[in-house]
Amino acid sequence: MTITYTSQVANARLGSFSRLLLCWRGSIYKLLYGEFFIFLLCYYIIRFIYRLALTEEQQLMFEKLTLYCDSYIQLIPISFVLGFYVTLVVTRWWNQYENLPWPDRLMSLVSGFVEGKDEQGRLLRRTLIRYANLGNVLILRSVSTAVYKRFPSAQHLVQAGFMTPAEHKQLEKLSLPHNMFWVPWVWFANLSMKAWLGGRIRDPILLQSLLNEMNTLRTQCGHLYAYDWISIPLVYTQVVTVAVYSFFLTCLVGRQFLNPAKAYPGHELDLVVPVFTFLQFFFYVGWLKVAEQLINPFGEDDDDFETNWIVDRNLQVSLLAVDEMHQDLPRMEPDMYWNEPEPHPPYTAASAQFRRASFMGSTFNISLNKEEMEFQPNQEDKEDAHTGIIGRFLGLQSHDHHPPGANSRTKLLWPKRESLLHEGLPKNHKAVKQNVRGLEDNKAWKLKAVDAFKSAPLYQRPGYYSAPQTPLSPTPMFFPPEPSVLSKLHSVTGIDTKDKSLKTVSSGAKNSSELLSGSDGALMEHPEVSHVRRKTVEFNLTDMPEIPENHLKEPLELSTTNIHATLKDHVDPYWALENRDEAHS
């Protein structure tokens, strides 16, 4: 059985733990009193022999042996060995408790998913939950001595109502040399599938949820079976037991009080009762007894699990949930807080002291002075570092100082401040220096800068950067040219459209590179890098002659080589191409 003392330590008060020392059931005294009396008896027998039965020479030999044992007794790592062992045992003990099968979730699913108020529906639900309880009992009687004493055979399970005679015969037909705790779970799965095929379970998702919960309980039963089969290695238990008992066997000799007249170091007092030796025995052997009791919680000790109570409780609760409580709901009605947005449940006189306001945060009650709540100018506005994109990337700071209070748009227009302020003024900079200062003082340059910022195109605004698109592959994408585009290409000066190769004609002082597409598809200039080299092609689009009516309009054949042609000097800048209308392209 389990010793529960939770209510006695609910409040940490003076003597709350001390009162637990007076308990006997499940206490360390009940586990330790036998070994302690044996140790006490052996200690005083050795003391009596040393004092009364030995001669002077024999006493001298015994005293040397005592000093030797006392000096080397600390070499036994009893605390280290016991600490790891008890930690392992307690962890294993709690894991076994977490794997105890509780059918509460499964019975809720069976009661809600398996429909039917008729006799067949009731039989189906009760049979399903009885199979779950039968699987739990079969595994518990395999690992718990208390449950096995209650149900020593399968016939006892039939008499107790966990299994019908037909199911018992079906179980005996299997005749496998293994534990049969898994058989009821197979019956449960097949019966659930039959209920779904018969329309008792509406949706296959509900069937899957039911089988998932069944598998969870089946897994817990398998874990209990594995914990019972695989114990803590015997060698570890033996090492811990030998270390503890050999330590205190040595203490029987090494902790004896010697004759004070012989002035041995540490033996100035001749005490009858070795208090600290007895306390050490109480702690270390008691520590070992804790591991001995928790190593198998399915026994009959005071702190073992209440397995028989678990069997009774699970059967009673689960049958009630799937039978009498199926679709037996109370009438719905508005609660007492129906029209209250913030319900306030009442407190009794004994619990009124525990009423607390809602916690808003640890900084909720902090108060600041009025001066401390005023915003200060940002450090950026004071320093006003104005760097380009490369300077910002390299961490460089500008030495230009902008006036405080400038917003983000006026900061971007700061490089153009001088040109905006000097627009329409004489070229003599010294003559208009005072006027510029006056404009700065009156912040007139800001208004003019904002107007210029709004009226300027997007590509001319400071801070606008247009990066070319990076191709995803070295092979350029090819789009068939439209007729309108072909007509424009025919009108480009310096290109012979009748030729199959695309060539640029140099005019004036402009130097143009040649882009040829030969029959072999290689570039004429540096063919070894033709697959990665980009050529610059110049087109003169300033004077575009009209296309004659009798001009041959034939498709322009492009070369098959990997070439990216980039317009370099166009009469319109690149931003004009970006902002052009789709209809006029």
Swiss-Prot record:
<keyword id="KW-1133">Transmembrane helix</keyword>
<dbReference type="GO" id="GO:0046872">
    <property type="term" value="F:metal ion binding"/>
</dbReference>
<keyword id="KW-0406">Ion transport</keyword>
<feature type="transmembrane region" description="Helical">
    <location>
        <begin position="32"/>
        <end position="51"/>
    </location>
</feature>
<feature type="topological domain" description="Cytoplasmic">
    <location>
        <begin position="1"/>
        <end position="31"/>
    </location>
</feature>
<dbReference type="GO" id="GO:0048167">
    <property type="term" value="P:regulation of synaptic plasticity"/>
</dbReference>
<keyword id="KW-0812">Transmembrane</keyword>
<feature type="transmembrane region" description="Helical">
    <location>
        <begin position="275"/>
        <end position="288"/>
    </location>
</feature>
<feature type="topological domain" description="Extracellular">
    <location>
        <begin position="52"/>
        <end position="60"/>
    </location>
</feature>
<feature type="topological domain" description="Cytoplasmic">
    <location>
        <begin position="289"/>
        <end position="585"/>
    </location>
</feature>
<dbReference type="GO" id="GO:0061534">
    <property type="term" value="P:gamma-aminobutyric acid secretion, neurotransmission"/>
</dbReference>
<feature type="binding site">
    <location>
        <position position="296"/>
    </location>
    <ligand>
        <name>Ca(2+)</name>
    </ligand>
</feature>
<feature type="transmembrane region" description="Helical">
    <location>
        <begin position="61"/>
        <end position="82"/>
    </location>
</feature>
<comment type="function">
    <text>Ligand-gated anion channel that allows the movement of anions across cell membranes when activated by calcium (Ca2+). Allows the movement of chloride and hydrogencarbonate. Found in a partially open conformation leading to significantly smaller chloride movement. Upon F2R/PAR-1 activation, the sequestered calcium is released into the cytosol of astrocytes, leading to the (Ca2+)-dependent release of L-glutamate into the synaptic cleft that targets the neuronal postsynaptic GRIN2A/NMDAR receptor resulting in the synaptic plasticity regulation.</text>
</comment>
<keyword id="KW-0716">Sensory transduction</keyword>
<feature type="topological domain" description="Cytoplasmic">
    <location>
        <begin position="83"/>
        <end position="237"/>
    </location>
</feature>
<dbReference type="GO" id="GO:0005886">
    <property type="term" value="C:plasma membrane"/>
</dbReference>
<feature type="binding site">
    <location>
        <position position="304"/>
    </location>
    <ligand>
        <name>Ca(2+)</name>
    </ligand>
</feature>
<dbReference type="GO" id="GO:0098857">
    <property type="term" value="C:membrane microdomain"/>
</dbReference>
<dbReference type="GO" id="GO:0022834">
    <property type="term" value="F:ligand-gated channel activity"/>
</dbReference>
<feature type="binding site">
    <location>
        <position position="293"/>
    </location>
    <ligand>
        <name>Ca(2+)</name>
    </ligand>
</feature>
<keyword id="KW-0106">Calcium</keyword>
<keyword id="KW-0472">Membrane</keyword>
<dbReference type="Pfam" id="PF01062">
    <property type="entry name" value="Bestrophin"/>
</dbReference>
<comment type="similarity">
    <text>Belongs to the anion channel-forming bestrophin (TC 1.A.46) family. Calcium-sensitive chloride channel subfamily.</text>
</comment>
<feature type="binding site" description="in other chain">
    <location>
        <position position="10"/>
    </location>
    <ligand>
        <name>Ca(2+)</name>
    </ligand>
</feature>
<dbReference type="GO" id="GO:0014047">
    <property type="term" value="P:glutamate secretion"/>
</dbReference>
<dbReference type="GO" id="GO:0160133">
    <property type="term" value="F:bicarbonate channel activity"/>
</dbReference>
<keyword id="KW-0869">Chloride channel</keyword>
<keyword id="KW-0813">Transport</keyword>
<keyword id="KW-0479">Metal-binding</keyword>
<dbReference type="InterPro" id="IPR000615">
    <property type="entry name" value="Bestrophin"/>
</dbReference>
<feature type="topological domain" description="Extracellular">
    <location>
        <begin position="256"/>
        <end position="274"/>
    </location>
</feature>
<dbReference type="GO" id="GO:0098793">
    <property type="term" value="C:presynapse"/>
</dbReference>
<dbReference type="InterPro" id="IPR021134">
    <property type="entry name" value="Bestrophin-like"/>
</dbReference>
<feature type="region of interest" description="Auto-inhibitory segment">
    <location>
        <begin position="346"/>
        <end position="379"/>
    </location>
</feature>
<dbReference type="GO" id="GO:0051259">
    <property type="term" value="P:protein complex oligomerization"/>
</dbReference>
<dbReference type="GO" id="GO:0016323">
    <property type="term" value="C:basolateral plasma membrane"/>
</dbReference>
<dbReference type="GO" id="GO:0005229">
    <property type="term" value="F:intracellularly calcium-gated chloride channel activity"/>
</dbReference>
<feature type="transmembrane region" description="Helical">
    <location>
        <begin position="238"/>
        <end position="255"/>
    </location>
</feature>
<comment type="subunit">
    <text>Interacts with YWHAG; this interaction promotes the ligand-gated L-glutamate channel activity leading to the positive regulation of NMDA glutamate receptor activity through the L-glutamate secretion.</text>
</comment>
<keyword id="KW-0868">Chloride</keyword>
